């Protein structure tokens, strides 16, 4: 995931 796109870590 990304720093601004991490719904579940």
Curated annotation (Swiss-Prot):
Disulfide bonds: 1-6
Keywords from the UniProt entry: Amidation, Disulfide bond, Hormone, Secreted
A Gene Ontology term for the protein's cellular component: extracellular region
GO MF annotation list: neurohypophyseal hormone activity
Localization (cell): Secreted
InterPro entries on file: Neurohypophysial_hormone_CS
Xref: Pfam families: Hormone_4 (PF00220)
Sequence positions bearing Glycine amide: 9
Family: Belongs to the vasopressin/oxytocin family.
Role this protein plays: Antidiuretic hormone.
Protein name in the entry: Vasotocin
Origin species: Cyprinus carpio
Taxonomic classification: Eukaryota, Metazoa, Chordata, Craniata, Vertebrata
